[in-house]
Structure formats: structure tokens, C-alpha cells
Amino acid sequence: MAALDRSMARVEFDPDGNITDANENFLTLLGYRRDEILGKPHRQLCDGAYAQSEDYRRFWERLRRGEHFSGRCKRITREGRPLWLEATYNPVRDGQGRLLKVVKYASDIDAIVHQEHEMQSKLDALSRSMAMIEFDLDGNVLAANDNFLATMGYGRAELASANHRQFCEPGYRDGPQYADLWRRLNRGEYVTGQFRRVHRNGQPVWLEASYNPVYDADGKLYKVVKFASDVSDRMRRYQAEADNAHQAHTLSTETRTVAEHGALIIQSAVEEMLKIANTLDASSLNIGELSQHSQQITSIVNTIREIAEQTNLLALNAAIEAARAGDQGRGFAVVADEVRQLAERTSKSTKEIADMIGRIQTGTRSVIDDMQHSQEQARRGVELANEAGAAILGIRESTHKVVEAVQQFSRTLNADL
């Protein structure tokens, strides 16, 4: 008894519940002096509402019948502060079996109760906001809250003999990842992540969840508690974004291919246009030389025309002189007439040649003008082709950056999925 008095709070009551004795531990715990508490009723140490309740009346009835009580009690200190005690009420009888007194031993568990209450409040808050389910170490369902039942579409009775496996897709639950999950949980590892599960109607459900191993008072692992939130809508958005990213990646890759092909075509076009420009330059030079030659021919024709005119004049003079000579100059006159006719034909042919050369020169000048215009167009075409080629190269470079960005975005989305 002395050892108990040193380690625990003790208070004694008569059969009517009035305090007859209390040790120092009890006085210190409740904040009373001895003279303040002796003779006071037990109800003074209790919450007012409880002291007036039917439960309180039955409590003392059981003690008066000699029934032992052990458990947690909420009592009130001298300052009015609630205090939780782990207590035993022990009825003591005399030799005739009459109730002599009730001895109470108690220890302060106020801090423990408040800690437990805080933990329970947190668990209650989690249970109100999240889906919660408990499993034994073989995956059999022990309990589930209403949020879990609503999320997965089950009734409470349906989970009485259920196992974690039935919430998983066949390909997953029969594979190595599922076996590894439960190996880790049975080793006491905490597992968190996004998990694809199956609704009662067979549709996929995405859960953001944590699997939490739970230990008993002896430190032995005995169950797993899972907290989860339904993130199916978010995952569907992620999947849609991933699909769009994949499509964008495909299109941007095709665009890059087209741009590269276009760059090659334009480069080939530039090379061909450069060849055309060079050919036009050479043709322009040849036509220029031809124009010079036609001008030289014109000069020669003019010289021939002048010679023909002079020959015609000389033939006319010779005919005049032959006429003066009479019969002696008749033969010379015939020759002079032939020379004159030849000079006239030469003059006529020379005129025709001059006209033809004039037309050739006119055509040549027109061709030269057209060639110069074509050269200018060819040069402008080369410049435009080069500009187009530079633009295509820019597009190709930009498309390459787009492809890289889309690839990175796609990888990020796939990692999230």
C-alpha cells in the first residue's frame, strides 16, 4: 500500500460518496489542500452535467453493491480545468459484508488522452474528406468509410469478405508489381502514389493514395490503412493533354520533315535558276556579238552599195563615151551596159540585204531587251529563292525547337501519368 501511495494518487470515500482521505499525490494532482477537500462529495470532482446524470447515479449504485470499476475518468481540478485519470474504484467491506468505504487509485493520463484525441480528430478529418479502407496483411478488407464506398461504388455488406485484389485490374493483380506492393507493405514500408483501380461497374478509377502500415502496442505490424482521393478527372485531363501532345509532336515532326524537304527543293531550284541566269548571261553575250557582227555586215553592205553606185555611174559614163565613138565604141557600149545592169542588180540585192539586216538588227535589239529583262527576272528569282530558302531554314529550325519542346512536354505528361 505504501508503494502505491508513493506512485499513485489515492482518495477514499464513505458509502455516501463523501471524501474521507486523500494522499499528497491526489491533492497535488487536483490542486486542493487537505482541509479543502475532506468531507466534500465525490460529485464536486466531476463535471456538473455528469454529476447530475443517470450514468453518475448508476455508477455509485454499482460501487455500493460492491462492484469494482476500472477505466478512464474525466474529473475537474480546483481551478476548473478538466483532467483525465486512469483510475480504479475499489469497494471495501467489513467483516459482516457491509460496504465500509471505496478506495480510488488514479494516475494522470491527461497528456495521453489529449494526444489521442488530437490524433483521432485528425483521423476523423481525414475520414470525412478522403476515402479510407483498412486491410489485414493478406489484403482482406477490415473496414471502409462511406467515402470509399461512394468512390468505388460498393455497399458496406459487399466488402465483408472482399480482398484488395478485386479493386485491381486482372493484368496488374496477377503481375509482379502487385506482388511487390504487398511485399513492401508486409515489410512495413509506406507506399504512396497514383493508382489505377476498378470501380464496381468495371470502369477505371484513378486514386491518389497512401498505404500506411499500422503497428500494435507490442510493435507488431497487423494491418494497413489506405487513404485515397479520387483524381480520375485530373488523370483524364492529363491523358487528353498527353494525347494532344503526342499529336502535336507527330504534326511538328511531319512539319519539320516537310520543311527539310522544301529546303532541299528550293536549294535545287536556286541552283537551276543560277544555271539559267548563267545561260542567259552567255546568250546575252552571244546575241550582243551577233548584233555587232550584223552591224559590221551592214557596214560592208553599205560599202558594196557605194561601189555598185559608182560602178553604175562609171558604166553610164562609158556608154556615153561609146556613143560618141560611134561604131568603134559599140562593143564597149555593150560591155558598159552589162556592167551597168550588174551594178543595178548588185545595188538591188545590196538594198534587200540591208533591209534584211535591218530587220535582223531590230529583232536582235528586241531579243537583247528581252534577254536583259529575263536576266533581271532570273536574278530576282534567284534572290527570292534564296530568301525562301532562308525562310524555310528558319522554319526548319523553329520546327526543330517546337519538336523538342513538345517531346519534353510529352515526356513530362507521361511521367505524371
From Swiss-Prot:
Name of the gene encoding the protein in the UniProt record: bdlA
CDD domains per record: MCP_signal, PAS
Annotated keywords: Repeat, Transducer
BP terms from Gene Ontology: chemotaxis; signal transduction
Paired cysteines (S-S): none
Database matches in SUPFAM superfamilies: Methyl-accepting chemotaxis protein (MCP) signaling domain, PYP-like sensor domain (PAS domain)
Domain PAS: 1-66, 115-188
Disrupted gene: phenotype observed: Cells are named mutant biofilms and do not disperse upon induction of the dispersion by succinate, silver nitrate, mercury chloride or sodium arsenate. They are resistant to hydrogen peroxide and more hydrophobic. They show higher intracellular levels of c-di-GMP (5- to 6-fold higher than in wild-type), increased adherent properties and impaired twitching motility. They display smaller, densely packed and symmetrical microcolonies.
GO cellular component: membrane
The name this protein goes by in its record: Biofilm dispersion protein BdlA
